[in-house]
Amino acid sequence: MENSYEETIDKRRVHLRPDTLRDPAPASLHLLPCEVPVNRPTPVGRFFTPAIRMGRDGLEASFRGRSLRGEEVVVPPGFVGYVVTEEKAEVLMGKQDDHERQEQELLEPPEALERDCDRFMGATASFSSFTVWGLESIPGPDAKLRGALSWPSLAAAIHAQVPED
């Protein structure tokens, strides 16, 4: 390595396992207008099991006594959404010690893409739509989410072949 910046980049290589993208189970997703200051598995279903009603202006539900208004958002055509989680090293390596792992790599060398990665991700579910919720009102067209979902069609338009006259 030439400098510490390159060392930092080297330690952030992530590999998304392609075999997990083949047939992940479909999921029902809800984007809630709140922040949870914890980054670990939690029994969300215990706290949010939506009784969704169709109101005059769209979907309605409540969360801990607060009124939520929402709408279904469809993933752009030609794309699929995935729920991705980090796979633990013990699961990947079968809790082998270094000597056993080195012997295993001699018999079955890791794929070139996996060799230099220190984090591995896998898809646990897929989705083609999700429900986005707002407090008291439906998130408007200016929401950051709408901007992010408009990029695929914008990129396709920019990179499309221009017909000759």
Swiss-Prot record:
GO biological process: RNA catabolic process
Residues annotated with N-acetylmethionine modification: M1
Tagged with keyword Acetylation: yes
Transmembrane segments: none
Pfam families: RNase_H2_suC (PF08615)
One Gene Ontology term, aspect cellular component: ribonuclease H2 complex
Localization annotation: Nucleus
Primary site of residence: nucleus
Domain of life, source organism: Eukaryota
Keywords: Acetylation, Nucleus
Subunit structure: The RNase H2 complex is a heterotrimer composed of the catalytic subunit RNASEH2A and the non-catalytic subunits RNASEH2B and RNASEH2C.
Function recorded in the entry: Non catalytic subunit of RNase H2, an endonuclease that specifically degrades the RNA of RNA:DNA hybrids. Participates in DNA replication, possibly by mediating the removal of lagging-strand Okazaki fragment RNA primers during DNA replication. Mediates the excision of single ribonucleotides from DNA:RNA duplexes.
Family note: Belongs to the RNase H2 subunit C family.
Record's protein name: Ribonuclease H2 subunit C
